[in-house]
Amino acid sequence: MIVGEPGPVDEVVVSLKELLQMEHCPRPWRRLDLYIVRDGSVVFYVGQSYTAFDRVWSHFYDGFKARSTLGRLIVCNWPASMHWTVELLSSGLERFAAVEHDLDAAEQLLIEELAPCLNEALNRQPSPLPKAYRPPTAPPTCPRSPNKLIREAAYAVKAEQRRT
């Protein structure tokens, strides 16, 4: 463990471009098992995984192979999608006490509460994808290389840091 590294956290909010600069899940984030991908008030997807960070990365890579609807949405809306927000949460948060911190039940609770556009399972009334976004079925207009998008995200992060 790195000296001075913080302990586990229950919630992290990061832009997709920032997440794409992290090759490995930071140790304090490893217990975060739920994730939300959104653009402001538009919630695209809610999911779960024993390591949510890794699952978001899987969606990103699988979008290039059309194996992930969320990943495809990211690719089809690049470069705007690099500014979307990724929320990583722990099912151990107090807000999930009513469902006894059960991971499946916590995910279902978030889906019912947020009605994400892309979740079809467990979602009685998914929000329609606003017309401002290209659907995941659209042909991508960005480079078909994940590494190129990761580099573009890195440039955007550096430009943002210079402005502040």
PLM region spans:
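Boundary/linker segments flanking structured domains
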Residues: 1-32, 38-44, 48-164
